[in-house]
Curated annotation (Swiss-Prot):
Top enzyme class: hydrolase
Residues noted as binding GTP in the record, renumbered to the chain: T112, K113, T114, D115, G162, Q163, S164, G165, V166, G167, K168, S169, S170
InterPro entries: G_CP_dom (IPR030378), P-loop_NTPase (IPR027417), Ribosome_biogen_GTPase_RsgA (IPR004881), RsgA_GTPase_dom (IPR010914)
Organism: Mycoplasma genitalium (strain ATCC 33530 / DSM 19775 / NCTC 10195 / G37) (Mycoplasmoides genitalium)
Summary of subunit composition and partner proteins: Monomer. Associates with 30S ribosomal subunit, binds 16S rRNA.
Residues annotated as domain CP-type G: 62-218
Subcellular localization(s) per the UniProt record: Cytoplasm
Cofactor annotation: Zn(2+)
Name of the molecule in the record: Small ribosomal subunit biogenesis GTPase RsgA
Organism classification: Bacteria, Bacillati, Mycoplasmatota, Mycoplasmoidales, Mycoplasmoidaceae
Alphabetical keyword list: Cytoplasm, GTP-binding, Hydrolase, Metal-binding, Nucleotide-binding, Ribosome biogenesis, RNA-binding, rRNA-binding, Zinc
Predominant localisation class: cytoplasm
Entry's family note: Belongs to the TRAFAC class YlqF/YawG GTPase family. RsgA subfamily.
C-alpha cells in the first residue's frame, strides 16, 4: 500500500472500522496516537488518510449529523407520502429546518404512493417548495422511477429518511434490490426481529447510500431560534429584517411578514411556520 491513501469510513465498530479504499472494502484501525486524543471519535462518512492499513488522519468534516451519526453528507433524501400515511407537514418542515441548519447541500423530496387518491391541494403545496430550490419527485409503484431521480445519487453520499409506512424500503428495493438485502441483513438479530443497527454506508452509483430505520427528528433543540434562521425560504430574507434576532411574527419592519402580506411568500407556509414555533 502506498505511503498516503485516502478512504471513506463505511462502518465504525469499536476499535476498528470498514473503509472504502481503492474500490474495495478493507478493515482499518486508528493509530494509537489518534485514539489517545480526548475528542477523537470516528464517524461513518469520515474521509481518512491511511498508511499501511492504519488510519493516521481524519480530514475536516463539512458537516455531521448525530442521528444517525454520519459525516460529510451531500444530500438528505426526504421521503414522504400524501396518503397512507397522510403527509405530516410540521414534521416535514421541522426536518427541513434541521437539515438546513446542518448545512446539507441538497435535500431532494420524494413523494410516494401517487397512484392512490390524494388531495390535489396538498400536491400543490409541495410544488410551492420548488421555488425554494428543493428538488421534488413524485413516484408511483405503477410507473418506472424517473431517470432524473436515479441520477441524483451519482457520486454523492445520500442519507434516506422518512416516517414509517411511506415506502422507503420499497423505493430502495426499486433502486437496487441488492441494497435492500444488505440493509435487511444488518437489521435482523438472531431471533429474526428487527433491531436498531450501526449506521452503515453502501456503495451505489459511484457514491454511497445510508438508510435510517426509525430516524425521526420530532423534538429539536432551540427549534424557535433555528426555524427563524433556517425555515424554508427564510435564508434570503432574514438579512433584510430590522432586527437581527427577528422571529418574524410581530416585530417592527420584518421583511418576512411584509413578503407574506404582499403575496411574495406563500401564506400557507408562513402559517405552518407560526404553528411550528408557537
Amino acid at each position: 500500500m502506498p505511503d498516503s491513501n485516502f478512504g471513506i469510513v463505511l462502518q465504525s465498530l469499536a476499535k476498528q472500522c470498514k473503509v472504502f479504499w481503492n474500490n474495495q472494502i478493507i478493515t482499518a484501525f486508528p493509530q494509537k496516537k489518534l485514539q489517545w486524543k480526548n475528542d477523537f471519535k470516528l464517524m461513518v462518512g469520515d474521509r481518512v488518510q491511511l498508511e499501511d492499513g492504519a488510519i493516521t488522519k481524519v480530514l475536516a468534516r463539512k458537516n455531521e449529523l448525530t442521528r444517525p451519526r454520519v459525516a460529510n453528507v451531500d444530500q438528505i433524501v426526504l421521503i414522504q407520502s400524501l396518503v397512507q400515511p397522510k403527509i405530516n407537514w410540521i414534521q416535514l418542515l421541522k426536518l427541513l429546518v434541521y437539515f438546513n441548519a446542518k448545512l446539507i447541500d441538497e435535500i431532494p423530496i420524494l413523494i410516494t404512493k401517487t397512484d392512490l387518491d390524494f388531495d390535489p391541494m396538498e400536491k400543490q403545496k409541495l410544488i410551492d417548495l420548488k421555488q425554494f430550490n428543493y428538488q421534488l419527485f413524485f413516484v408511483s409503484k405503477n410507473e418506472p422511477l424517473p431517470s432524473e431521480l436515479i441520477d441524483i445519487f451519482s457520486k454523492k453520499l445520500s442519507v434516506f429518511t422518512g416516517q414509517s409506512g411511506v415506502g422507503k424500503s420499497s423505493l430502495i428495493n426499486r433502486l437496487d434490490p441488492s441494497l435492500k438485502q444488505k440493509i435487511q441483513a444488518l437489521s435482523v438479530n438472531k431471533f429474526g426481529k428487527n433491531t436498531t443497527t450501526k449506521t452503515t454506508l453502501f456503495s451505489f452509483r459511484g457514491g454511497f447510500i445510508c438508510d435510517t430505520p426509525g430516524f425521526n427528528v420530532i423534538s429539536i433543540k432551540n427549534l424557535k431560534i433555528l426555524a427563524a434562521q433556517h425555515f424554508v425560504g427564510f435564508q434570503k430574507m432574514i438579512s433584510k429584517c430590522h432586527f437581527s434576532n427577528c422571529y418574524h411574527q410581530y416585530e417592527k419592519d420584518c421583511f418576512v411578514t411584509t413578503s407574506v402580506m404582499k403575496n411574495r411568500y406563500p401564506s400557507w407556509l408562513y402559517e405552518k411556520y407560526r404553528k411550528m414555533i408557537n
